[in-house]
């Protein structure tokens, strides 16, 4: 039984779990949800807040902001594209946090189940790369000596153009 709060992350129906939330990401529950009888592989990627960024030591926390109305449709486009490229996907979850996150906290989850590991790894890699390139979520970094918007921001692309 999944333990996440339905008011925060609604019950999942179907085989795609797409969400933007200010609350803690359900790492263990998303893994359990992805396990399917016909799938021998589940790949779970959890992006966590690290203590440094390019040219910046001593990162203390990140604050994520998003264009809320556009996030889930973009996540849906990524899931759709992944299913076109890897039709054997059993389940796919794309979940991202907003708000202030301290070092070590999970900010993004990509979970993919497939019958075999190669496809699960490939699809998960595609999904996180497409999410980073096409979903309007931005991070503000706070470190010992100051703060600024993240240096790794890229222009927003369509999921289908990510290779």
Task: Give the label of every model feature segment.
Residues 1-107, 113-115, 121-125, 129-163:
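N-terminal, polar/charged subdomain of small-to-medium soluble alpha/beta proteins
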């Amino acid at each position: 039984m999944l333990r996440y709060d339905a008011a925060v992350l609604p019950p999942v129906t179907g085989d795609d779990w797409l969400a933007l939330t200010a609350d803690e990401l359900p790492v263990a529950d998303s893994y359990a949800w992805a396990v399917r009888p016909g799938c021998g592989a589940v790949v779970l990627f959890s992006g966590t807040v690290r203590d440094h960024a390019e040219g910046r030591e001593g990162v203390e926390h990140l604050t994520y902001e998003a264009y809320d109305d556009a996030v889930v449709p973009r996540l849906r486009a990524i899931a759709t594209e992944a299913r076109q490229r890897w039709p054997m996907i059993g389940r796919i979850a794309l979940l991202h946090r907003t708000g202030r996150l301290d070092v070590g906290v999970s900010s993004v989850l990509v979970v993919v189940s497939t019958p075999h590991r190669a496809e699960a790894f490939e699809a998960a890699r595609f999904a996180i790369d497409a999410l980073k390139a096409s979903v309007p979520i931005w991070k503000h970094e706070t470190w010992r000596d100051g703060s600024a918007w993240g240096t790794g921001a890229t222009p927003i692309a369509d999921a289908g153009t990510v290779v």
